[in-house]
């Protein structure tokens, strides 16, 4: 299995160097490394040239934002799976890539560590639902995405901070792509890095995406459900199944009794 590791950078020389070290230090051999720099002026290009032998493709030129740069990286990728490890973010350990090779789903998602936190963040259950995504986005630093899926659902560049969330909605929820949640800690997330600058327009983008993809009544229902505790939702499912089961048993019993009476 071949991976394409893609790093987006703009004027984050120190963060870029940490990221590159974590990528080239992987013990898995079959991967390519792509760096898309947005025309940095802080010495980032010098860092890239320092590691040029380990980089498959790189470019430094102005772009139209992070998602434009990420799509640009995708266009140069040839791997089976893509992962975006943007400047400042790092692979958690040297064996991350080798630990994912047994999975074949369209999208594989692990965990991240935020800043100095010792508690992993990410999805903590096997499946994923629309409600889960209404509550939070999946960490792109921990997502391995099949290249054909990324090409089918490229990042929508009109959304400046939440296009990766739209990708998850379109691919997993609407497109019904196969999904695997794993307990592997994939990345150490730099809370001051390029991927952290998303709070300004997040809610604005999210509302616009929901309006674009779903009828208002569906959005309203799921917005309400997103604030209900998982345990309560699970209990409701069990209750519903119990009621249905009782009705089925009762109906079957009545049928048998009627059949016996006829005899």
Question: Which residues are covered by each model-predicted region?
Answer:
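Cell-envelope/extracellular polymer assembly enzymes that use nucleotide-activated donors
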Residues: 1-4, 32, 166
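A conserved acidic beta->alpha catalytic loop
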Residues: 37-46, 86-90
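Short aromatic/hydrophobic "clamp" motif used to bind/position activated sugar donors
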Residues: 82
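Conserved donor NDP-sugar-binding/catalytic core segment of glycosyltransferases
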Residues: 90, 94-121
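Glycine-rich, basic loop-to-helix element that forms the pyrophosphate-binding segment
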Residues: 19, 44, 60-77
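Short beta-strand/loop segment that forms part of the nucleotide-sugar
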Residues: 30-39, 59-62
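N-proximal low-complexity "stem/linker" segments adjacent to membrane-targeting elements
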Residues: 1-25
């Amino acid at each position: 299995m071949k991976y394409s590791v893609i790093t987006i950078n703009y004027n984050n020389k120190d963060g870029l160097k940490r990221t590159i070290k974590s990528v080239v230090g992987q013990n898995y051999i079959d991967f390519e490394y792509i760096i898309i720099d947005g025309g940095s002026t802080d010495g980032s290009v010098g860092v890239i040239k320092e590691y040029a032998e380990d980089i498959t493709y790189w470019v430094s030129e102005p772009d139209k934002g992070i998602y434009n740069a990420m799509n640009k990286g995708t266009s140069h990728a040839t791997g089976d799976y893509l992962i975006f490890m943007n400047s400042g973010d790092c692979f958690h350990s040297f064996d991350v890539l080798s630990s994912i090779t047994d999975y074949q789903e369209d999208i594989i998602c692990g965990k991240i560590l935020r800043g100095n936190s010792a508690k992993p963040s990410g999805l903590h259950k096997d499946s994923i639902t629309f409600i889960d995504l209404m509550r939070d986005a999946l960490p792109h630093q921990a997502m391995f995405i099949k290249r054909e899926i990324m090409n089918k659902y490229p990042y929508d560049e009109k959304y400046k901070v939440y296009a990766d969330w739209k990708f998850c909605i379109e691919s997993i929820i609407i497109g019904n792509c196969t999904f695997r949640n794993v307990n592997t800690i994939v990345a150490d997330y730099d809370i001051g890095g390029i991927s952290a600058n998303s709070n300004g327009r997040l809610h604005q983008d999210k509302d616009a995406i929901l309006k674009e993809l779903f009828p208002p009544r569906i959005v309203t229902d799921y917005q309400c459900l997103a604030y209900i505790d998982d345990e309560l939702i699970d209990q409701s499912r069990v209750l519903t199944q119990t009621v249905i089961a009782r009705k089925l048993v009762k109906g079957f019993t009545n049928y048998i009794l009627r059949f016996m009476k006829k005899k």
